[in-house]
């Protein structure tokens, strides 16, 4: 078993001055913590993997393809591989768990 604490992951991500911290990688999936501060621009490009986002804190909008929805703590979003997507109108610091399948390269 592998277990993680969100507060420890956030501290590690912040200490490394990065927006993304991959903290688990297995044969069929990887998981990371993604952070965007209020007002930030999301620089993402489409990925070669399916993704699931679980918002652990913050508020924003996300556009996936041509669809846009508001997200906040507890929101879960599925993004198919190759589809354009980005968070925007980030009104509260956003922290998101990201699951990639297959694992991110």
Give each language-model segment a name.
Residues 36, 47-62:
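Short, conserved beta-strand element in jelly-roll/cupin
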Residues 52, 59-61, 68, 84, ...:
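Structural motif
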Residues 81-105:
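Ligand-binding loop in jelly-roll beta-barrel domains
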Residues 27, 63-67, 90:
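Short strand-coil-strand connectors
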Residues 67-81:
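Short acidic-glycine-tyrosine-enriched beta hairpin
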Residues 28, 38-49, 102:
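Short beta-strand/loop turn elements enriched in aromatics
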